[in-house]
């Protein structure tokens, strides 16, 4: 009896019981990991002065070590930047709509292209995908795996015409001059508009003007897409912070209601989240649909474009241009490091997967990066972010005056740095006693991800200013 009680007690307080970030009182272990990034960052600063006082030689070696590590990273950054830029440039030249349509008749198109030579981006991979679809399911490796009941997974490849895109654009108090170009970019996409469900999630806190904007957009685009759905996110809902995540989550729940009414299969709907200033490449939706079809494990994938902060780059003040270009370079580099790629800003994920895991977190400011960890833990490690090598263009920070612009830029960078909150979210699960039993995740792969997460935030906070 005692053992059963003990087992129940351990299960009750398991870190794996919920995907949500705890609010209010946290455990000592959780607080330790919350403190860890800041403590390490301060330690690196303080250590430089302490070592210099104890021994100038040791202090010099410590500083040289930091500079040497940074130099090695810089070489890798240059290489990945050039590689990523070339990939993005070549991918933008591909007619992804044509490639998607070629999946309708894979056997015929494989015979036509199997001996063809082309320098087009990922042309050989496209031919292999046609072969995979034309030969049949028996040769698909993932079909040979067994599920938890000892049966083979059913592998299917949906037809291009069966795919629906649901685009969720969220906004707070932005004007029509910002909102309309974003909707227009989706409208001008090479993907068929009548298979795009556009959801506009706006905040009640945005006031009467935002409600008018939503009404205008709904009327203006009512006949453009399969459906244009304005959704007002009520203010002051329980267990929510003020941020993008709750708005996105609320809009997604309304989307689910609509999809059910239309009898559209959840498994064939891909959801893309957009900020109000995002302008997607015309190929983006076709590119995502293509990758969605050719990957049998599609429900356990999300699709990450390259975010470039260049919409208003020549209007922004010089300091903001430098930061915007640096952030754009970082995203280009990330697209070439698929083993470390995480969700950032705009991204796409299957509706079926989102509905099963409870959509996005309503308790974190950085809902995009946090979504990676939610998905990873929900799928017990069987989750991956697939790079989409075309851009979604965003605004560089710009306000009415230089002082306001600098303040807004600081707030944006600070908001991104809140991603350090994921260190505790990941750490408590990594070092939990029931990680193997309930999380079904191996220690070393998760430890490597945890260390990269921790190192990234410590580097940003401590090493960058020191160098």
Q: For the regions a protein language model found, what residue spans apply to each?
A:
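Hydrophobic alpha-helical transmembrane segments of multi-pass membrane proteins
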Residues: 62-66, 169-170, 341, 454
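Internal catalytic domains of large membrane-associated glycosyltransferases
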Residues: 89-421
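General helical secondary-structure elements
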Residues: 69, 229-232, 448
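Basic/Trp-rich segment in TM-proximal cytosolic loops or flexible interdomain/linker regions
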Residues: 2-42, 52, 87-90, 335-337, ...
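Short, structured coil/loop segments at alpha-helix boundaries
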Residues: 23-31, 51-63, 123, 193, ...
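Hydrophobic alpha-helical membrane context
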Residues: 85, 287, 380, 464-467
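N-terminal membrane-anchoring/stem segments of glycan-assembly enzymes
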Residues: 1-155
């Amino acid at each position: 009896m005692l053992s059963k009680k003990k087992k129940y007690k351990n299960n009750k307080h398991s870190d794996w019981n919920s995907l949500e970030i705890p609010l209010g009182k946290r455990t000592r272990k959780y607080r330790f990991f919350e403190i860890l990034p800041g403590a390490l960052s301060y330690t690196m600063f303080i250590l430089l002065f302490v070592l210099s006082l104890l021994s100038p030689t040791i202090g010099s070696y410590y500083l040289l070590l930091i500079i040497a590590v940074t130099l090695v990273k810089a070489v890798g950054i240059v290489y990945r930047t050039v590689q990523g830029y070339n990939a993005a440039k070549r991918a933008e030249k591909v007619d992804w709509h044509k490639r998607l349509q070629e999946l309708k008749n894979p056997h015929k198109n494989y015979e036509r292209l199997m001996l063809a030579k082309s320098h087009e981006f990922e042309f050989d991979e496209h031919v292999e995908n046609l072969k995979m679809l034309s030969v049949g399911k028996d040769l698909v490796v993932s079909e040979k795996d067994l599920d938890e009941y000892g049966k083979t997974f059913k592998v299917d490849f949906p037809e291009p015409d069966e795919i629906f895109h649901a685009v969720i654009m969220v906004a707070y108090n932005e004007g029509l001059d910002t909102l309309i170009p974003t909707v227009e970019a989706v409208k001008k996409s090479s993907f068929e508009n009548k298979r795009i469900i556009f959801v506009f999630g706006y905040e009640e806190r945005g006031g009467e003007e935002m409600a008018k904007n939503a009404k205008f957009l709904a009327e203006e685009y009512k006949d453009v897409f399969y459906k244009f759905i304005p959704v007002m996110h009520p203010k002051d809902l329980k267990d929510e912070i003020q941020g993008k995540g709750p708005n996105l989550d609320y809009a997604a729940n309304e989307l689910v209601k609509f999809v059910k009414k239309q009898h559209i299969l959840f498994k064939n709907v891909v959801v893309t989240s957009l900020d109000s200033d995002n302008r997607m490449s015309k190929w983006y939706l076709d590119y995502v649909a293509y990758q969605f079809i050719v990957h049998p494990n599609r429900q356990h994938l999300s699709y990450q474009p390259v975010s470039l902060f260049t919409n208003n780059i020549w209007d922004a003040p010089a300091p903001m241009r430098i930061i915007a270009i640096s952030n754009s370079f970082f995203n280009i580099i990330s697209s070439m490091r698929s083993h470390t790629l995480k969700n950032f800003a705009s991204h796409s994920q299957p509706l079926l997967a989102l509905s099963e895991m409870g959509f996005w977190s309503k308790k974190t400011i950085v809902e995009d990066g946090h979504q990676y960890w939610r998905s990873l833990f929900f799928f017990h490690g069987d989750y991956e972010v697939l790079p989409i090598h075309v851009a979604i263009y965003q605004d560089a920070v710009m306000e009415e005056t230089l002082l306001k612009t600098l303040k807004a830029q600081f707030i944006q960078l600070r908001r991104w740095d809140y991603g350090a909150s994921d260190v505790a979210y990941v750490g408590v699960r990594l070092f939990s006693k029931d990680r193997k039993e309930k999380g079904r995740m191996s220690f070393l792969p998760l430890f490597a991800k945890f260390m990269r997460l921790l190192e990234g935030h410590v580097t940003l906070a401590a090493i960058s200013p020191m160098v």
